Amino acid sequence: MNPVRNLVPEIRAFRPFLPAKDYETSLRFYKAIGFKAYPLGDTMAELSLGPHAFLLQGYYVKEWADNMMTHVLVEDVDMWWRHIDSLDLTNQFGISPPSAPRGEPWGLTVAYITDPSGVLWHFAETTKLDGKKP
């Protein structure tokens, strides 16, 4: 028996709020990547990939957006990279070019993408300490 389970009620979902400087542009950006959007009002939507989701809101604070990072652990970061690279996100949305996957010292291979509001996304895959995929 898990003693923590007895003390803390279980949760059904964990969905962070992400800022959108221009809500419609951000919504199109995430849809282009492959997120499904479920509107929750004029300037809020739940965006999901499978069972994982976040809430996009039409609210923006530069300091928050520029310091926000989101981590997505995937099975095959190279496959994700080919998908992301094929979308030409820089020309479509005026963002900095996404960074191709690279091995990081903390044991992950990570591709980096910055959304139109400045939120940094890490698409990552676990690697062995020798830098090779398991």
What is the predicted function of each stretch?
Residues 58, 104-105, 112, 123-130:
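Short beta->alpha transition motifs characteristic of CBS
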Residues 70-120:
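Vicinal oxygen chelate
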Residues 36-74, 120-125:
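Conserved short beta-strand elements that form part of the metal-binding/catalytic scaffold
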Residues 23-26, 88-95, 134:
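Short, positively charged
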Residues 9-12, 62-67, 104-105:
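Short glycine-enriched loop/turn motifs at secondary-structure junctions
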Residues 1-25, 70, 126-134:
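N-terminal beta-strand motif that seeds the catalytic metal site of vicinal oxygen chelate
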Residues 10, 17-54:
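Core segments of cupin and vicinal oxygen chelate
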